[in-house]
Swiss-Prot record:
The lineage of its organism: Bacteria, Pseudomonadati, Pseudomonadota, Alphaproteobacteria, Caulobacterales. The keyword rRNA-binding does not apply. This is Tetraacyldisaccharide 4'-kinase. Belongs to the LpxK family. Keywords: ATP-binding, Kinase, Lipid A biosynthesis, Lipid biosynthesis, Lipid metabolism, Nucleotide-binding, Transferase. GO terms for molecular function: ATP binding; tetraacyldisaccharide 4'-kinase activity. The gene is lpxK. It comes from Phenylobacterium zucineum (strain HLK1).
């Protein structure tokens, strides 16, 4: 059973869930210690091609995959993913005509529709397979805390949503008492740049967030929808790191949202869950709407009945992006 991301993780105010935070804090110390030792003891090995890591400092929901897609498109690179949720250990090149999300994971299958994508639980083996297949550069989706591969460049993606008491790092505590994969200072010390990914309706990043990240170059990008939401009433659903972000984006774009159903990240939709959503939509004569990542996980018969709402990362200053990644 997969659990949904606790929303209180991303509340900057420690007054929310104080007992839970306190009880989980010793486990956070252990998690942080194990992560630090693993990184310190590792000896990264060369993959045979430059590797750009696009990673997270938090447990998910920052918008990393759209940034991976944009950088890989820009550089003509191959994407490397662990293939979370997939059954194949790899290395294997993803073929959308052959593979299903249950084999290679949802994000790799989604990206493979227009990019060369590899999945491998062994990141080094996957990067070397991509290099052997002719990859000029490998863009690694996630892996900032994975020290096995020598990285030419490490970018960390940070959620730029800071309204309504949200903060991308919560109160700074490490998993499971908070959203951090490791302490902020430790993660930033290994980064070459940070990407603040803003929601489409937020004009500029919080100056305090820019200041916190200022020890590395900071790039600004915006998560822009590829088109308006469908006309008419919609029942929307999402099983992503922060499903409430999808709901908020739809409302900001003017979607006539009659109901929103959140699911855990990478949720495997079955016929029963989808039938309930379809019944709810039928009550209001509504359409069914989801994210591109969720849509790729749907059983093929349901893809005709549900519309995806794709988004892409648009960088505010493309010259600044080229200055960071263009030398590879």
């Amino acid at each position: 059973m997969k659990l949904a991301t606790p929303r209180w993780w991303y509340e900057r105010d420690r007054r929310s869930m104080p007992m839970t935070r306190a009880l989980l804090t010793p486990l956070s110390w252990a998690w942080a210690g194990v992560t630090a030792r693993r990184i310190a003891r590792a000896r990264p090995l060369d993959a045979g091609a430059p590797v750009i890591c696009v990673g997270n400092l938090t447990m998910g929901g920052a918008g990393k995959t759209p940034v991976v897609r944009e950088i890989a498109r820009r550089l003509g690179g191959h994407v490397l993913s662990r293939g979370y949720g997939g059954s194949l250990a790899g290395p294997v090149r993803v073929d959308p005509a052959v593979h299903a999300s249950g084999e290679v994971g949802d994000e790799p299958l989604m990206l493979a529709r227009d990019l060369p994508v590899w999945v491998s639980r062994d990141r080094l083996a996957g990067a070397r397979a991509a290099a052997a297949a002719g990859a000029r550069v490998v863009v690694m989706d996630d892996g900032h805390q994975n020290p096995s591969v020598k990285k030419a460049l490490s970018l960390v993606v940070v959620d730029g949503e800071t309204r309504n008491g949200e903060w991308p790092f919560g109160d700074g505590r490490v998993f499971p008492a908070g959203p951090m994969r490791e302490p902020l200072a430790a993660g930033l010390a290994r980064a070459d740049a940070a990407v603040i990914l803003l929601p489409a309706d937020l004009a500029a990043p919080d100056p305090e967030l820019v200041r916190v990240l200022s020890k590395v170059p900071v790039l600004i990008a915006r998560l822009e929808p590829e088109g308006p939401p469908p006309v008419g009433p919609q029942v929307a659903f999402a099983g992503i790191g922060k499903p409430w972000k999808f709901e908020r984006a739809l409302k900001a774009a003017g979607c006539e949202l009659v109901e929103f159903a959140p699911f855990p990240d990478h949720y495997a939709y079955d016929a029963a869950a989808l039938a309930l959503l379809a019944d709810r939509a039928a009550q209001d004569g509504a359409g069914l709407l989801t994210t591109e990542k969720d849509w790729i996980r749907l059983p093929p018969a349901w893809r005709e009945r549900v519309r995806p709402w794709p988004v892409r990362a648009v960088f505010q200053d493309e010259a600044a992006l080229d200055a960071v990644v263009g030398g590879l």
